[in-house]
Amino acid sequence: MRTFSPKPSDIQRQWHVIDASDVVLGRLASRVATLLRGKHKPYYAPHVDTGDYVIVVNADKVVLTGKKLEQKRAYRHSGYPGGLRSIPYSELMAKNPARAVEKAVKGMLPKNSLGRRMAKKLKVYAGPEHPHQAQKPVPYEITKIKQPA
């Protein structure tokens, strides 16, 4: 049996909008990564970008469980020797909450050119507004599982 490869004409991209308020960060990221990869579609193929566009709003209201807000750190490297920088997630969420969501989702995508192309279809906004009304995004519901602190 030959490997199925969807043609570009077969792929229909849709826009989804997700409200991230009171949703656990990891659960949100895994659902978003599935939509970006296209694994929810019947013609999914791992070597083809069949995914949809995803808009995440209210990224500043996303929840980290346990003590992760104080203990977990976000790392980045400049590429130079000794260029590793880290900040706690509490500081990252205060400064740039959209970056925290992007970082979580990108960690769940493939680490190659296909994954980078998929990541470009992710749009994250800290507030409730987004400039993509013309694309007519469809609301995508994620169960709010905010666990007690």
Curated annotation (Swiss-Prot):
It comes from the Bacteria. One of its GO terms (biological process) is translation. GO terms for molecular function: mRNA binding; structural constituent of ribosome. Pfam families: Ribosomal_L13. One of its GO terms (cellular component) is cytosolic large ribosomal subunit. Keywords: Ribonucleoprotein, Ribosomal protein. CDD domains: Ribosomal_L13. InterPro entries: Ribosomal_uL13, Ribosomal_uL13_bac-type, Ribosomal_uL13_CS, Ribosomal_uL13_sf. This protein is one of the early assembly proteins of the 50S ribosomal subunit, although it is not seen to bind rRNA by itself. It is important during the early stages of 50S assembly. Part of the 50S ribosomal subunit. Belongs to the universal ribosomal protein uL13 family. This is Large ribosomal subunit protein uL13. It comes from Thermobifida fusca (strain YX).
